[in-house]
Amino acid sequence: MEARTFWLLVVAVLALGSSSSTGQYVGLSANQCAVPAKDRVDCGYPEVTPEQCNNRGCCFDSSIHGVPWCFKPLQEAECTF
């Protein structure tokens, strides 16, 4: 019984670890992070990790060199009629 509990705990920890490392837009929609490179407003600091960036409520995308990788998301507009 103890071995089963141990393995369930290991699986749970691995699942939590892998889910946090794959998401670049934790708590944000992909649309909010679709900021053109020229319009990115820096939200981080040199050598910020994706996790640190996301913890600040910012987007992380390191695919374009020479622009901020950690940047402020777009504000989603609310539709009012």
Curated annotation (Swiss-Prot):
Domain P-type: 31-74
Entry keyword Secreted: yes
Main location: secreted
N-terminal signal peptide: 1-23
Alphabetical list of InterPro entries matching this protein: P_trefoil_chordata, P_trefoil_CS, P_trefoil_dom, P_trefoil_dom_sf
CDD domains: Trefoil (cd00111)
MF-aspect GO terms: identical protein binding
Organism domain of life: Eukaryota
One BP annotation, GO: regulation of glucose metabolic process
Cellular component aspect of the GO annotation: extracellular space; secretory granule
Compartments, as annotated in UniProt: Secreted, Extracellular space, Extracellular matrix; Cytoplasm
Cross-referenced SMART domains: PD
Keywords, in A-Z order: Cytoplasm, Disulfide bond, Extracellular matrix, Secreted, Signal
Database matches in PANTHER family: INTESTINAL TREFOIL FACTOR-RELATED, TREFOIL FACTOR 3
Summary of the function given for this chain in its UniProt record: Involved in the maintenance and repair of the intestinal mucosa. Promotes the mobility of epithelial cells in healing processes (motogen).
Protein name per the record: Trefoil factor 3
Organism for this UniProt entry: Bos taurus
Gene designation per UniProt: TFF3
